[in-house]
């Protein structure tokens, strides 16, 4: 049992580190940088499951909250979480949760896509509140231009996680 817990903690730590590193791959655009964070969040959920995925994502958010520059473009601190794009970071929690739910491939992919929509909705709401735009206008700025790319990343993350699970036994 102890050996299995060490293995779980190792995977959780590695996933937090991977999220922190790959979050830095960001192409600046007008309001929201283009990133591959949707891929990483989905991969963590699909690979670690609900409990460990939530632990990993919570650890990532807490690291950023205390100022470690783990968020996109080497950002960290409370100001990032309460900024225009902070809602997306909070949206990682339902996103990783839904990706972590067990089931057959079509169900898991569908849940991952619902999780992505929950993440985008959190981002849209926070952006709309801070910018005083309508939800629709905020969606046009921070969500809709990236949605197809992010959906493809979620589907890709599912298949990568399945390969990883087979290789790491």
Describe each model-derived feature in a short phrase.
Residues 18, 22, 26, 44, ...:
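Alpha-helical membrane-inserting segments
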Residues 23-36, 61-95:
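Interfacial aromatic-anchored transmembrane helix boundaries in multi-pass membrane proteins
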Residues 5, 50-55, 104-109, 134-135:
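Membrane-helix interface segments
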Residues 1-54:
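Hydrophobic transmembrane alpha-helices
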């Amino acid at each position: 049992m102890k050996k299995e817990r060490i293995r779980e903690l190792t995977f959780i730590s590695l996933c937090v580190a991977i999220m922190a590193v790959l979050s830095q791959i960001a192409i600046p655009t007008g309001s929201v940088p283009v990133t591959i964070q949707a891929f990483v969040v989905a991969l963590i959920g699909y690979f670690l499951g609900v409990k460990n995925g939530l632990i990993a994502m919570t650890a990532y958010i807490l690291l950023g909250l205390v100022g470690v520059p783990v968020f996109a473009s080497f950002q960290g601190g409370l100001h990032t979480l309460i900024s225009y794009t902070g809602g997306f970071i909070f949206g990682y929690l339902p996103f990783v949760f839904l990706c972590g739910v067990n089931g057959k491939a079509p169900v898991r992919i569908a849940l991952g896509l619902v999780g992505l929509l929950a993440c985008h909705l959190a981002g849209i709401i926070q952006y709309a509140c801070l910018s005083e735009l309508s939800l629709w206008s905020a969606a046009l700025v921070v969500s809709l231009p990236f949605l197809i790319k992010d959906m493809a990343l979620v589907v890709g993350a599912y298949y990568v996680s399945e390969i990883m699970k087979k290789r790491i036994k």
